Regions:
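Structural preference for solvent-exposed beta-strand-turn elements
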Residues: 1-212
Length: 212
């Protein structure tokens, strides 16, 4: 992480009033100097859910409102959790998704159920699909619509994958994944899977290499 370029994050947090030292350095370690008067901003989101979540959390601690305008759908765990439990956030859905955060509000503590990671489940799913006469049940996996592109793509190409015992908690859908080995057609992924299967592309490449 120390080698990762944080320029986008630094620029955004600077708009809230934060200061980073030394200046013109965009990777960690950095010294962060907070401000006593953080002011909400308007932010046009890209596909990075991490940057969007950073803006949401910074907006919670800023005066006034912070607006996030989202043209492309990205992972939405943070806003799902907040809108379910607090009145500090509003979401308008249309051609563009607009998230508005009202900062400096008191937040009550809550209990959160965190389901299993679908990206981790993808590796065990691949192992089962590629081994003859194999079956697997993975319990309590997050099935958020922005996270299941890997499974949707494989099902489209013949993989025997089923979601069962589906339920909802804190605005998050989760359930059990049932996998049975079998023949998979050659994979072809359109651009709509880009954000929904970003982390799973390496294992998809392996599956594609081993299918007939």
């Amino acid at each position: 992480l120390n080698k990762r370029n944080m320029k986008k994050l630094i620029v955004i947090m600077s708009e809230f009033g934060a200061e980073f030292l030394p200046k013109n350095k965009f990777n960690f370690p950095l010294k962060l100097i907070s401000t006593e008067m953080p002011i909400g901003i308007n932010y046009k989101a890209g596909v990075s859910a991490q940057l969007k979540s950073a803006v949401i959390l910074a907006g919670l601690n800023s005066f006034g409102s912070t607006k996030i305008i989202e043209d492309e759908k990205s992972r939405d765990h943070t806003e799902n959790m907040l809108i379910k439990n607090f009145k500090t956030i509003k979401i308008k859905r249309g051609k563009k998704k607009i998230i508005e955060i009202f900062g400096k509000k008191y937040l009550n503590s809550i209990n959160i159920n965190v389901p299993g990671d679908p990206s981790s489940a993808a590796f065990f799913t691949a192992l089962t699909l590629l081994n003859k006469n194999s079956s697997l049940k993975i319990k309590n996996v997050g099935l958020n619509s922005t996270r299941v592109g890997f499974f949707q793509l494989l099902k489209k190409h013949g993989a025997n994958i089923k979601f069962k015992n589906i339920r909802k908690d804190n605005n998050e859908i989760y359930g059990d994944i049932y996998v049975t080995s079998g023949k998979i057609k050659p994979l072809k992924a359109s651009s709509k899977y880009y954000t929904k299967a970003t982390d799973e592309y390496p294992i998809l490449f392996i599956i594609a290499a081993l299918t007939q």
